[in-house]
Regions:
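Membrane-embedded translocation segments of transport machinery
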Residues: 4-27, 31, 39, 43-87, ...
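Pore domain of cation channels
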Residues: 4-18, 105-140
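Alpha-helical transmembrane segments
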Residues: 18-34, 134-154
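Alpha-helical transmembrane segments and their helix-start/interface "positive-inside/aromatic belt" motifs
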Residues: 33-48, 154-165
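Final/C-terminal transmembrane alpha-helix of multipass membrane proteins
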Residues: 159-178
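Juxtamembrane boundary at the C-terminal end of a transmembrane helix
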Residues: 174-188
Length: 194
């Protein structure tokens, strides 16, 4: 999902939340933002971390419960334990963001990783676009509402801060539990010589 499209989704959510917080009808670009747009925007915003976390769970399950399959592909992890989970999580995060980076401890040039990363890339790119086009279509069907005293201004510093808070809460906290647990476990693990 490209930055512009993600930002569009987060603006829809921020407009809706801000409008409800101050008791005004949520409007964006002269169109009312209602529950249908909000539901689609929420699904789109949560789809990205959902795909990443589900595929990380699948790869972890396969690594633990099907070691014969992992060994037939040459093994995946050079760093066992929780750092290996971090490597798997980062691999799928990198694929979903389409940036191509990764931890080097993960042996990811195998059929399993190539196929699953390709699936993550497709799901993370094209499914959100469907939702964003649906939101645009719903907004296009609505009548234009002229700006009034009750219209929430979207070009102010306050709205910018609200948008930042929404992005932080939804995007950053989606991965907070797994990152917090991995960090705590890394700290508590005894140091191993590599």
């Amino acid at each position: 999902m490209c930055i512009r499209d993600s930002y569009y989704t987060f603006i829809i959510i921020a407009v809706f939340i801000s409008g409800l917080m101050v008791g005004r009808t949520p409007e964006f670009l002269g169109k009312k933002v209602e529950a249908r747009e909000m539901k689609i925007a929420t699904i789109v915003a949560l789809l990205h971390p959902f795909v990443i976390l589900v595929f990380t769970a699948i790869s972890s399950y396969i690594y633990v419960h099907h070691p014969d399959f992992v060994e037939s592909e040459g093994g995946w992890l050079n760093n066992l334990g929780f750092h290996g989970l971090s490597e798997q999580l980062y691999e799928y995060t990198s694929c979903a963001a389409n940036n191509g980076s990764g931890f080097e401890g993960l042996g990811d040039n195998t059929y399993f990783w190539n196929w699953t990363c390709g699936i993550v890339l497709i799901l993370s790119r094209f499914l959100p676009i469907i939702g964003q086009v649906a939101i645009a279509g719903l907004l296009a069907q609505k009548k234009f509402i002229p700006e009034s005293a009750g219209t929430l201004k979207t070009d102010t510093l306050t709205f910018g801060v609200m948008t930042f808070v929404v992005i932080f809460i939804i995007a950053a906290l989606s991965f907070f539990p797994v990152h917090a647990l991995l960090s705590l476990i890394h700290i508590s693990e005894p140091t191993r010589p590599y």
